[in-house]
From Swiss-Prot:
Required for the first step of histidine biosynthesis. May allow the feedback regulation of ATP phosphoribosyltransferase activity by histidine. GO terms for cellular component: cytoplasm. GO terms for molecular function: histidine-tRNA ligase activity. This is ATP phosphoribosyltransferase regulatory subunit. Belongs to the class-II aminoacyl-tRNA synthetase family. HisZ subfamily. InterPro entries: aa-tRNA-synth_II/BPL/LPL, HisRS-like_core, HisRS/HisZ, HisZ. It is found in: Cytoplasm. One of its GO terms (biological process) is L-histidine biosynthetic process. It comes from the Bacteria. It comes from Brucella abortus (strain 2308). Pfam families: tRNA-synt_His. Pathway: Amino-acid biosynthesis; L-histidine biosynthesis; L-histidine from 5-phospho-alpha-D-ribose 1-diphosphate: step 1/9. This function is generally fulfilled by the C-terminal part of HisG, which is missing in some bacteria such as this one.
Length: 378
């Protein structure tokens, strides 16, 4: 069998045909990318896996670890009109304990579409069609989550803005969420800060704290430019202190845990969420209207809603995801079975420097996993 890393493999050519049929411009993205956008916006797991280097000017560069960020940066650089659909098919590079560090991804980024529900449904339908074109008989599991419903739940519970931001950053990471909820209940013990730092944190003196942190880093032989800056660390320490001073009623936290435990088929999800909101006097009306509109659009796209699992705890701990998130998985492989993943990232292009808000939704397919699955089923 031809390795999936080859651009001459049958799966590569088959996916090129699928992408060309979906009204998306196939773009070429340079292998060498500025590292900062990935370091600033990617999740902790991806940051650890990036291959970093520098040019002769000392600028941080990396081998392309994924496509969404560079495709969006390319769109901004070209000052391209929207709506616009981009397709990609090429190598990405990530450090792995096992297996090759170079592998292929394919996907579509849909930028600037006015109809959010329709473009969400189209993204899922396109991803599913691409997967089924390569592995038509494989048992698949589709899991869907919604960052905006979780955000609406936090607001309805009356959580302060700081805690909402913290919990949203943990959404989709079960361990991080457990730690955050333990902090919110006051049951998570924190290591005490040295007294000199603790005084500045208690006073909210971000400038003084940053100066002291920088001095300590230099004394320890650590470059202040490596990783988070002293200012960022100071801001995070003060934020943690403010959050630690807030404790929330146990009953409200119990409701949040009940919400995160909701896992039903998509055809029952809106009914389940509306009943949960009504039973607990929670105002989720606006976000549930959008949720229902998307579910209707998914049904109109020809996807059986009963075949999709809505998991209220499923998300991605990245600041730029704003709504839909989904994965298409190999139902026979629970350990490493994610074949494709996608979601809505309406904040990303603004964070990358776009002059105006540009909504976006897209997906990526893991070709190595898909080829392995297709080979097993042949």
């Amino acid at each position: 069998m031809t390795m999936v890393g080859s651009r001459t493999s049958p799966i590569f050519n088959a996916l090129r045909v699928e992408l060309n049929a979906r009204e998306a411009e196939l773009v070429e993205i340079p292998l060498i990318q500025p590292a900062d956008p990935f370091l600033d916006m990617a999740g902790e797991d991806l940051r650890r896996r990036i291959f970093l280097t520098e040019n002769e000017n000392g600028d941080s560069l990396c081998l392309r670890p994924e496509f969404t960020i560079p495709v969006c940066r390319n769109h901004i650089a070209l000052n391209a009109a929207t709506p616009k659909r981009y397709a990609y098919l090429g190598e990405v590079f990530r450090q792995r304990r096992d297996g090759a560090a170079e592998f292929l991804q394919a996907g579509i980024e849909d930028l600037g579409a006015a109809d959010e529900a329709a473009s969400d449904a189209r993204s899922l339908a396109d991803a599913l069609s691409c997967v089924k074109a390569i592995a038509p008989d494989a048992p698949l599991e589709i899991v869907l989550g919604d960052q905006s419903v979780f955000a609406g739940m936090l607001k309805a519970l009356g959580l302060p803005q700081g805690w909402r931001k913290k919990l949203l950053r943990s959404f989709g990471d079960a361990h991080s969420m457990d730690l955050a909820l333990a902090e919110l209940t006051g049951t998570q013990r924190r290591d005490p800060l040295p007294e000199s730092l603790a005084v500045l944190v208690a006073e909210g003196d971000e400038i003084g704290l940053a100066r002291m942190l920088e001095a300590e880093m230099l004394e320890a032989g650590i470059s202040p430019g490596a990783g988070r800056t002293p200012v960022e660390i100071a801001r995070r320490l003060i934020e943690k202190e403010d959050l630690a001073a807030t404790h929330f009623p146990a009953a409200a936290l119990d409701l949040l845990r009940q919400f995160l435990a909701i896992r039903v088929s998509l055809d029952m999800a809106a009914v389940t969420l509306r009943a949960f909101a009504a039973d607990n006097a929670l105002d989720l009306g606006a976000v549930l209207q959008k949720f229902e509109a998307r579910a209707d659009a998914i049904a109109q796209a020809g996807i059986e809603m009963k075949d999709i699992i809505y998991d209220a705890s499923f998300g991605r701990p990245l600041d730029y995801y704003t709504g839909l998130v989904y994965e298409i998985r190999d139902a026979s492989n629970r350990q490493d079975g994610v074949l494709a993943g996608g979601g809505r990232y309406d904040r990303l292009l603004t964070m990358l420097g776009a002059c105006e808000a540009i909504p976006g939704v897209g997906f990526s397919i893991w070709l190595d996993r898909l080829q392995a699955l297709a080979g097993e089923k042949q």
